[in-house]
Amino acid sequence: MVHKSPPSRRACRKYGGVFDVAAYEARIATLEAAAAAPDFWSERARAEALLAELKTLRATLEPWRALRRESADLRALYELAREAQDASLEPELSSLFSDISARFEEASLTRLLHEEVDRLDAFVTIHSGAGGVEACDWAQMLMRMYTRWAERRSFCVHIVDLLESEGGVKSVTLKICGSHAFGFLKGETGVHRLVRISPFDSAARRHTSFTSTYVFPVLDDHVEVHIRSEDMRVDTYRSGGAGGQHVNKTDSAVRITHLPTGIVVTCQNERSQISNRATALSLLRARLYAYERQKKQQEHQRFASEKKDISWGNQIRSYVFHPYTMVKDHRSKCETGNIHAVMDGALEPFIRSYLEFLCTSTQCVEPQ
């Protein structure tokens, strides 16, 4: 017989210790009452924001409700089978247990996300740093890693801006669309260090390369970021490309400079200048939001200038291919020897360990 049992109430307390079901239910009831009011749509922006919050709260709470019901049912079935010594139910019990356990892990990961913007899509910007051609190849490897992670979760990935270079990618901005994409990926911001035998070195020597990643939320309309038109300089230019029939023969690429902060964003991968401008503005809003958050937290790193030294001493994670294989996060201390799985998008252990690390160092706030 199967000796495993579904996630226990003790396990639920372990992973959901800061998850107050009653607080969620109370907030949902308050929002539902507000939505039923006759004058609810008198302020459209506020109404849409409340509905978005209601949708997020329901999506967060429902998996826990379902898990509680299904876990209780499975536990009852397990006890009956054990008392009757009925081994024929073992395959079904094992399958149900695996399914519930997987969804429990996903729900316990999501409950670590409490910031307003955690539910949003994400911009992921990657810049190659110290290491020359090797660093450009490393940036391309990280681009693939995040793309594979998104594909594993059935998220959509769109290239907003791409600057190719010899050996790989000089810089790239991805837009990753999916539930809580920003919340899951926000811990990827920082410098990533690669150690390997370089395929570009004929002497087969070991090289160290650095690449920086910056993750920003794709803000929706209810997150206020005010940008004055006089504070922006908009430049258009011809999109780059590999040549052939897809080369853009018009000045459709857009570069926007925010004059007060010096933040520069570009977009060249949409089909028209209008679309490129809209995407660039969305990216600028995200960058300014992150910039203001950094100022409020009184941190020294500035997302605007992106001048943090992409080299020794600043890395958040190391990826070692030689003389041994290991990926180690220097903040949460999470590590694994299966580096190839990580490079193929298996980031969940690092995402979870960082969010748990973040939750122990900050106060997680439940709905009010």
From Swiss-Prot:
UniProt cross-references to SUPFAM superfamilies, sorted A to Z: Release factor (SSF75620)
Compartment(s): Cytoplasm
Residues annotated with N5-methylglutamine modification: Q245
Broad class of the protein's primary localization: cytoplasm
Keyword line: Cytoplasm, Methylation, Protein biosynthesis
Source taxon at top rank: Bacteria
Gene Ontology CC entries for this record: cytoplasm
Protein family: Belongs to the prokaryotic/mitochondrial release factor family.
Protein name per the record: Peptide chain release factor 2
Organism annotation: Treponema pallidum (strain Nichols)
Gene transcribed to yield this protein: prfB
